[in-house]
């Protein structure tokens, strides 16, 4: 059985009619709170702002055509009424060369240069724990589901759709990875059901990183790779 087939067989469709599509700039208001919810602690440390300000920044950055927060990197599950139910980002390591440039511009534009300096320094610390994807990798990030839809299988169905449509490779041609907080046992269990396995840690954790941001990198279909 292929990896895609295994995921499809293991994950039922959500109870209500759901469709899946690439995100658009018009989804910014709906997706920004979900993107924030995918990493409340991480964004709080990185941006050093209130939840409201973090979400406002993400909403603006989501509307951009460029960078890691752009709508062009995201896929969404939507209900019959068009409401966004779940979101995920797909970062291709072969196309992230200028991500840092775009995030500097986005931060300076929203928060101002003085605030941005501290944010960039904290971002460097965070990246020691959550590294950008290598050129050989595709990083899945910003995985979140509307709280009213959690437990319905909608995110799993969104992930499955990304495999079936080719938005994510399911044939092992690229290494698909994601990061999950060590303390987020529920999310890790979900990713394991989807076929992700934890990778051994190969880097020393920064002393400047808060303990609650300790993370595990996982790889899709890792048990089939050398």
Model features per residue range: what roles?
Residues 51-74, 79, 129:
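Active-site rim helix/loop that mediates acceptor-substrate recognition in acyltransferases
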Residues 19-33, 44-45, 92-93:
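A short beta-loop-alpha structural element at the N-terminal edge
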Residues 145, 151-165, 189-193:
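Conserved acetyl-CoA-binding loop-helix of GNAT-fold acetyltransferases
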Residues 39-62, 97, 109-112:
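Conserved GNAT-fold acetyl-CoA-binding loop/helix
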Residues 76, 83-92, 139, 144:
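Conserved beta-strand in the GNAT
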Residues 94-138:
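Conserved acyl-donor/pantetheine-binding loop and adjacent beta-alpha core of acyl/acetyltransferases
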Residues 137, 172-177, 181-188, 192-194, ...:
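C-terminal "cap" of GNAT-fold acetyltransferases
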Residues 1-26, 216, 220-226:
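Conserved N-terminal entry element of GNAT/NAT acetyltransferase domains
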